[in-house]
Amino acid sequence: MRLHPLVVCADGFSMSVQANGGAYCSPRVEGAERYDAVEIGFPNKSEPLILQYMEGGYSEDGAEPDPTQSVYPYVPVSVVSLVLAKHGGMVGGEVPPGVAALRAPA
């Protein structure tokens, strides 16, 4: 199972973006040429564009969901691209095939 390095954006926002046979993605296979939806995990800040996909993620006291401690299954790649653009583009990490790897301007 291939894991992609953590995505870090120009403004400091970071998240895991995965697609493989064990991830919540579509297609749910290893090494697809292109994915239509991917799994986001554990962003370092709450991101409104992905909140509707949040699963679990409860705080230590169990009272409220914590968006930074959650997995976001089956997020459309177009939404991931919007998140990257909103945060100034990628300065580090890698996204699965099908996600536009929007890089921050040099």
Features from the language model and the residues they span:
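Low-complexity intrinsically disordered segments
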Residues: E47-A106
